[in-house]
Design a protein with these regions (language model features):
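His-Asp phosphorelay/catalytic-motif detector in bacterial-type signaling
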Residues: 45-47, 71-75
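Short, conserved "switch-loop" micro-motifs in signal-transduction and mechanochemical regulators
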Residues: 70, 82-83
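Short amphipathic alpha-helix used as the core "switch/output" element in two-component signaling
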Residues: 39, 61-72
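Active-site residues of response regulator receiver
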Residues: 52, 80
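Acidic catalytic/metal-coordinating carboxylates
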Residues: 33, 59-62
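Conserved acidic carboxylate
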Residues: 8, 55
Length: 83
């Protein structure tokens, strides 16, 4: 089963993404901030990371810079609600 990390600080959007992806058969780990995302990435491998750009304790770009050297095969898709 493919495992997806959802990193989104908007709790409603986080829950909706997680719900729909779970319904489609994916294993989901969902977190609300960059610190918890970094901890999750240290504990296991993910096939995909859905990554919010604006997080309360950092930004998705910086987190992606940490992800790719350690997990080069992990796909990262950025999410944002910015205009």
């Amino acid at each position: 089963m493919k495992h997806i990390l959802v990193v989104e600080d908007d709790s409603f959007l986080n829950k909706m993404l997680s719900y729909n992806l779970t319904a489609d058969g994916y294993e989901i780990t969902s977190v609300l901030n960059a610190r918890t995302a970094a901890e999750a990435l240290r504990s296991r491998e993910f096939d995909l990371v859905l990554l919010d750009i604006n997080l309360p304790d950092g930004n998705g770009y910086d987190l992606c810079k940490l992800i790719k050297p350690e997990h080069p095969d992990t796909i990262v898709i950025f999410l944002t609600a910015n205009d």
